[in-house]
């Protein structure tokens, strides 16, 4: 993957850049800005502000959403969609993938450790999200948690909390089913198997260690 130019802590996503999101096939899911405690960079204590998770490429969105469980049923895949969106302005993101980001960790009283990107305790990354939001960043660029090769980049985009009209948040949006090319790439690169038959409730339990990837929970 080509690394776009980054100045200091800033990572600029130019207007019109295609971004990718894998999400449930339900109303409001494309431009959903989460406020719960269950999102790594959610703005849990900022009134009326939430976080929408995207990626710079389709496989990055696929692995970030589905990489926790390495065996999926076809029904599970069919219940999801792949959306390609673009924004009508440049996005200024804080780039957590750069070593220079350590200063930001220290200013928030945090250690520069992989737990920010991949740990199960979300308190620290949520504190960082609040810090960057208050510094007028549009969001955060980080390494996809479930990618052991650290090749794919994810985006935590800040915006109005809850479901939003897609055409208000994004300049363009195309949504389709998850194609076989993406499924094949997920299997070849990350070992995510998609089975034609249903998986038992226990096997598809996201809390079951048997079906979790080594990278953990995203």
Where do the language-model regions lie?
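Active-site and NAD+-binding cores of ADP-ribose-processing enzymes
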Residues: 1-36, 71-218
């Amino acid at each position: 993957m080509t690394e776009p130019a980054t100045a200091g802590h800033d990572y600029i996503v130019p207007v019109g850049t295609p971004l990718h999101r894998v999400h449930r096939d339900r109303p409001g899911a494309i431009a959903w800005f989460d406020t719960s405690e269950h999102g790594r960079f959610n703005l849990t204590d900022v009134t009326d502000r939430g976080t929408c998770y995207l990626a710079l490429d389709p496989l990055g969105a696929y692995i970030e959403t589905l990489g926790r469980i390495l065996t999926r049923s076809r029904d599970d895949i069919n219940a999801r969609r792949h959306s390609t969106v673009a924004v009508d302005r440049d996005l200024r993101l804080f780039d957590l993938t750069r070593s220079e980001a350590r200063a930001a960790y220290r200013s928030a009283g945090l250690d520069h450790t992989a737990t920010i990107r991949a740990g199960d305790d979300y308190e620290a990354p949520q504190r960082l999200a609040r810090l960057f939001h208050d510094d007028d960043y549009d969001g955060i660029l980080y390494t996809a948690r479930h990618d052991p090769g650290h090749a794919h980049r994810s985006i935590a985009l800040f915006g109005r909390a809850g479901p939003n009209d897609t055409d208000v948040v994004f300049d363009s949006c195309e949504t389709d089913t998850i194609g076989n090319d993406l499924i094949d790439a997920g299997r070849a690169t990350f070992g995510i198997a998609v089975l034609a038959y249903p998986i038992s409730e226990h096997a598809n339990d996201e809390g079951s260690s048997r079906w979790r990837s080594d990278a953990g929970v995203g």
